[in-house]
Amino acid sequence: MDEIMSGEANDIQKSAYLTALAMKGETIDEITASAAGMREHCTRLLNDMDVLEIVGTGGDRSNSFNISTTSALVISAGGVPVAKHGNRSVSSRSGAADVLEKLGVEVALTAEQNETVLNETGICFMFAPVYHSSMKYAAPVRKELGVRTVFNILGPLSNPAAATMQLLGVYDKELAGTMVEVLSNLGVTRGVAVCGEDGLDEITLTGETDVHEIRFGEITSYTITPEQFGLSR
């Protein structure tokens, strides 16, 4: 991954590596190392507070509205610092950047600008193309391959502020368990990976949601239902 992100690997090497990983299935250690490699080559947002990331993998084909961005605003208003990392729409009606631009927010802020915004308001948005410029080395090969690769799940794991708290929506039940292990490996001390039984990369209102929770290195798994929160299906 380091050679891909630094531009040292050629297209044949990139294709072979990504295809081989996809065919055999990425392990927890391989996903962790890949995410760490992306973080190593990103522009960092420096801060002296514990911040929360709330994001989904996408890929659930639900065409839902951008739940994570609206939730981020509510969470921040409740006093939890949020450093959200995101991009434009992939599988939903609108991505985080699309929503914020419609609200009049300048999304392409530098790390220095976002440090000020975070300290003053308790929330900031890190637009992926600004912070992960090294993705330019992977983008052409990903487009040519035209299949799902490890990069499809690395975005939610590559927060430039090194968030220690995270709520991660995952489109696949089995993958959610893997992703929570990766989050723990990457330094998240409090967080959850969730997957709705209907395939949403969200906490669903139509049935049960699988939850995998990290609390300072200890991982527990359980399910929740809408009824537990006074909501009907």
Locate the predicted segments by residue.
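Short glycine-rich loop/turn motifs that provide flexible caps or phosphate-binding loops at active sites
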Residues: 6, 24, 55-58, 78, ...
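Glycine-rich anion-binding loops and their surrounding alpha/beta cores
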Residues: 40-43, 64, 79, 101-108, ...
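Generic structural signal for well-ordered, non-membrane alpha-helical segments
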Residues: 10, 14, 27-31, 35, ...
